Amino acid sequence: MQTDTQPMSHPLIQESSQVDLDVLEAIQQRILWLAVRMVDSANNDRTADEVKVGGHQASSASLVSVMTVLWFAHIGGSDKVAVKPHASPVYHAIKYLTGELDRSYLTRLRSFGGLQAYPSRTKDPDVADFSTGSMGLGVVAPLFAAAARRYVDAHGGPTSQEPARFIALAGDAELDEGNIWEAVTDPSLQGLGNVTWVIDTNRQSLDRVVPDQKIKKLIEFFRGAGWHVVEAKYGSLLQGEFDRPGGDILRHHIDEMPNEQYQSLFGLEGPALRARFLEHAPDGLAEFIAAWSDDQLGRTVRNLGGHDLGLLIDSFRECDSVTDRPSVVFAYTVKGWGLPIAGDPLNHAAFLTAKQIGELRSVAGLSTDTEWDRFDPATPEGRLCSAVGSNINNRPLAPRPTLPIPTSAGQAVPGKPTSSQEAFGRILTRLASIPEVGNRIVTTSPDVSVSTNLGGWINKVGVFHPDEQPDYLSDGRLLRWKQTRAGQHIELGISEMNLFMMLHALGLAHELHDEHVLPIGTVYDPFVCRGLDALIYALYNDARFVIAGTPAGVTLAPEGGAHQSSITPSIGLELPGLDYVEPAFAQPLDWLLCDGLRRLAEPDGSSLYLRLSTRPIDQTPFADCAEATDMERLRQDVLAGGYRLREPDGAPAEVVLATCGPVTPEVLGAADILADEGLASVVLDLTSPSRLYRDWRVSLRSASREARTAHPTFHLARLLPHHERGLPIVTVHDAASHHLAWLGAVFGARTVPVGVDEFGQSGTIADLYESFDLTSGQIANAALVAVS
């Protein structure tokens, strides 16, 4: 059996306008077998552990047909696909058949160093285009990747690249996730005609059958958002019966049948199946199907479009023909298709028995000696697998380019009190003028660009829009909101999840689009938590970007507790792949931002989290420190995580005051008070607590692994000479007090942590600092407690 396809949708079809569905059927059956057997092997062929290995045979089976058509009759090498998490065995089976995955991995699903439970960009040997596993995020990742590709293309990206399509495979229950709808409705993501989502509509979630009206509502949601909707609902066998005289009765009955009733048909045979199917049936339906045998009835009523290969090819072709908006295909499938557990409401975590595995092996035409074999290369199936592999399998990726990023943007040290947020905006504007750097920077913000000091940058580079827009409101305004294809700022709606997903997409532009950009996002600091799942997802994928959380802390006094962050520094310190910095002064911020942009391209680099403030701070203390210190040494200390801002005056220090961010003036004031009391102190400005901590932790881990004494080669040991390492420490931070409390453990010193351990409220900075013991007098008292 053959069907027409689009000539340019697949490597083999470039020479032929036909796809042999019999070959696809054979490949589909082998993929089903391998996916199911991989899960079976993981749970039964290894030494038993205390924890169940798990896996999803039924969820994999429901997408076998869709993925067979996509990989073997639709996508090409430039296309990117996000695989439904629970279908990861299907993905690995495809990568094995096409030659990318070594056979040894098939028995290492969910094992250390083997195949991950869910598709992973960073952990799997057959690198996935998008990691999936955190529900909802993998679904929208291709949508944001398409937006990033649109941006790259508009800014002179590689002209040799073929056009790319971005596809997501999602379960129908996954559409419960709210971040999906935040993305679907965002104006910046409209008009992406190279995006297709395929919804695995098997009507089952983890615990239950999906309620009846849900799918209809979802379809209307997509249509209301301007998406093109395709329903691959009924297979050709069932469609043929609908076309017979009286077939409209059959269609109406199935359309109106409750999901629970329809799902129950998969567990019934013979007269019981017929009786259940005819419950609440309209007049005439019993006569319409009277001539059907029980077997024919079962084959017909279970014939859904999500398992009809020809219909799926046509559905994807239709999506390709719509180029002015995204498309979504609702592929009606059977959870557990082709397996004895098909349609069982409790099949999500069910495993086939050894007897059932043996029967499935026989259906696949295999034996225990051949069960892991690929197709013979000389067969039509083998030739197709080879051709697909040569076109779509991953190739080595060139490293990110080294850019001429300076150590400083050349921002003059302000002569007046300046906030770190204000300095950030000025530094960014100066970076725009640096060749090969400014043109690669792209900023994005969830409708807070002006209030996070991106106004100067936007005036200089403009706002990105795929089609130039008229500007009716800029006359006489300080902010010029000019929207063109050349703009370098992407404005999002008020969604922090979308912000981090956009940063994720831009931060992988080199890997996905062969173009390295420098993404910088801004967000109100307390709402870093609101987008935390997407932030973690981006870092897990090794996306590289800069995020500025500003304004931060109770220093944002008038805004009240809802806008005053306290735990975000802990997030910055504890997340892998993220360097958290909180400079108090403008020059260290300049150094840190330039260094952070440089690290985005390094193989072992990281993303950068700037925690900033709107509080103007006198820059004189840093200028005095710089005058008394070698400037390059000072810069290196700042980048390493901290420097000695003030030395004890005359007498040896008796206490260490460690701080960062906007409370630094209060700490310096406390040092003055202590000096008047005859107590000398050293003040450390910790520009990056996360770098300090990790440096110390690496030293300890290395020593513990080698069973030796840890040598004090970490940066904090360089900041505190031997005679100061046992001194009491007072840590002061506009954040949760525990965030810096670990400092005392480094050298076994008595520690008094001062910080924000309750929710704030509206007031002045003086009010809030008094409330949280952040005034100079209270900090001095804490130092007296520490030394007492």
Regions found by a protein language model. Give the residues of each.
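Glycine-rich phosphate/pyrophosphate-binding loops
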Residues: 78-79, 150-160, 508-527, 545, ...
